[in-house]
Structure formats: structure tokens, C-alpha cells
């Protein structure tokens, strides 16, 4: 840090220290920028994702307190493991009760599928081949999952662009119906 002295050179000495510190900070920022550019995540292409999924398994009913190391230890006899993932809930940040294992080659999947039903932390686990996710929540190859006319939330029923008919069962002209059990009340006036 800069020291303040009572000399006439104190301002020039102080400025030299600031320049030296700013040069050091600039070097650090340049190193970090290079590191961030090289480490930027690029999602795999569709073909690359299919190749990864062909070498991966889904593991269900995993204990919530399981660790990646424990899962890898349980599946180490199946083949060389590239990556193990336990997804977490976006909001609570707690891990979910399933995991994915990516193997080095696709022949390891058959060995892993044999582990289906085995006990892991006193729970029977479900092991299946990982499927490739189809983005779009049901829009795409699988078709729409929101009814015949592709209704989403808040969309009107019926064919798109068609006028909707609204049926009103009760009309209260002079206020609400104050009678009980279908009674007309004192103020009922249908016209």
C-alpha cells in the first residue's frame, strides 16, 4: 500500500506506487480474461450428445445423501468411468435421487445394466440406458402434449382463430341472488 511522507517527493512517490499497482492489476485481469475465454462452456452438438448418451446410463432411486465417489465405487467394475453427475434442484440446491454415469466406451453399458436392482446404500437402484433428451417439452418429433389444437396455458378451447361462445347460466340484474337453495330472493327481477 502507499505510504504518505512529508517530503516534497511524496506525490511523485505515491503516483509511482499507484502506477505499479495498476500495472499488476492489469496483468491479473489479462490472465483471467484469457482463462475465461479458453474455459468457456460450449454445449455439445446434437451428434456429440447422441454419442455421449450412447455411452451413458441413468441410475434411479439413488439415496439423497450419496456422493459421486460412492456411485463410482459401486460401478467401477463395469468399465472406465469418464464422468458421474448427480443433478441438483434449481431452487433448493439439494441433489435429486438419480444420477448419470458416462463410460469410456459403449460396451460398459451392458455391464452396468446388470447392476439394475442391486442395493446401493440399502436401496434397490434402477439402471437403464440413458435416452437422448428431445428439447421443446413435447414439441418436435414426439408431437404436442397440450391437446388437439396445441393449447398452452391460458389459451382458449376449440380451434385456433375461431370465435368462442360463452354460456352464462345465471344473470343477476338487480344484484346477487340472496335467496337460499335456488330461491329467488326479494329482489329478483328477470327483466
UniProtKB/Swiss-Prot annotation:
One of its GO terms (cellular component) is nucleus. Residues 55-132 form the RRM domain. InterPro entries: Nucleotide-bd_a/b_plait_sf, RBD_domain_sf, RRM_dom. The keyword RNA-binding applies. SUPFAM superfamilies: RNA-binding domain, RBD (SSF54928). The keyword Metal-binding does not apply. Residues 136-160 are annotated as: Disordered. GO terms for molecular function: poly(A) binding. It holds the Pfam family RRM_1. Keywords: RNA-binding. This is Putative RNA-binding protein EEED8.4. It comes from Caenorhabditis elegans.
